[in-house]
Amino acid sequence: MSEFKGCPMGHGAAPQNGDGGDSGDTGNGWHGAQMDFARDMSYGDYLGLDQILSAQHPLSPDHNEMLFIVQHQTTELWMKLMLHELRAARDGVKSDQLQPAFKMLARVSRIMDQLVQAWNVLATMTPPEYSAMRPYLGASSGFQSYQYREIEFILGNKNAAMLRPHAHRPEHLELVETALHTPSMYDEAIRLMARRGFQIDPEVVERDWTQPTQYNASVEAAWLEVYRNPSAHWELYELGEKFVDLEDAFRQWRFRHVTTVERVIGFKRGTGGTEGVSYLRRMLDVVLFPELWKLRTDL
């Protein structure tokens, strides 16, 4: 019988001693684990942890500012992954490669679920605690997140006015401008349906990509045909449901944002100059994929 080696990643290795206890230090490593990384890449090296964990620089003396910084930095990391997945999924839809796109869209929805839960951590910050650090934030606001703006644009909520907060950083402005001028995920899905023979109005298939998604009757008619006969159009049916899953998760993320902000600052104006909760509530009315929601009434 061959000797048990355990998981190739080093987990679950066979005990080094006869009784299977915890005293597995043989002098060469703990249960066979490599202990010397003077010449090899370690966990921290691979993840760049020195850079990540030294990127928190509170400006106030308040204990709770670290929570505020870590909350928003981790959100930006998750949004980086969302953009990675959304761009690839959009490319998949554009090239008629829907199966890989389904996995990517499902992953984005789960990331949004993660971000919904993250608001529960920030909600542990009370109004007095936030008030103690708020003066140190200046005019900085999540409203200015260029990654969030890219996500909005990729999902079809275009607004050229939202370029202005990024004008002072040309490298960020270029990314947001590119997202503004590129067909959204939903635009590519509609063009895919047209390529597959559905009767879509030409002005929708080739439109001004800088404008937000608007309801169109021919698009709803196409989706209705898909939903009335899913077995004949299974890929498009699954794509439609992936979009609905994604928007549902996005709405929950937005809603939890509203309730957390109201809990912490009430109806004060946001640090970025917006109306705070009132502005965020209006954003809840944005519909990314209008035909996919309306058809549920019309089926």
Curated annotation (Swiss-Prot):
It comes from the Bacteria. InterPro entries: Trp/Indoleamine_2_3_dOase-like, Trp_2-3-dOase_bac, Trp_2_3_dOase. Substrate binds at residues 68-72, 130, 134, 271. Its cofactor is heme. Pathway: Amino-acid degradation; L-tryptophan degradation via kynurenine pathway; L-kynurenine from L-tryptophan: step 1/2. Keywords: Dioxygenase, Heme, Iron, Metal-binding, Oxidoreductase, Tryptophan catabolism. One of its GO terms (molecular function) is metal ion binding. Gene3D superfamilies: 1.20.58.480. Its EC number is 1.13.11.11. The keyword Iron applies. It catalyses: L-tryptophan + O2 = N-formyl-L-kynurenine. Pfam families: Trp_dioxygenase. Heme-dependent dioxygenase that catalyzes the oxidative cleavage of the L-tryptophan (L-Trp) pyrrole ring and converts L-tryptophan to N-formyl-L-kynurenine. Catalyzes the oxidative cleavage of the indole moiety. Belongs to the tryptophan 2,3-dioxygenase family. HAMAP family: T23O (MF_01972). This is Tryptophan 2,3-dioxygenase.
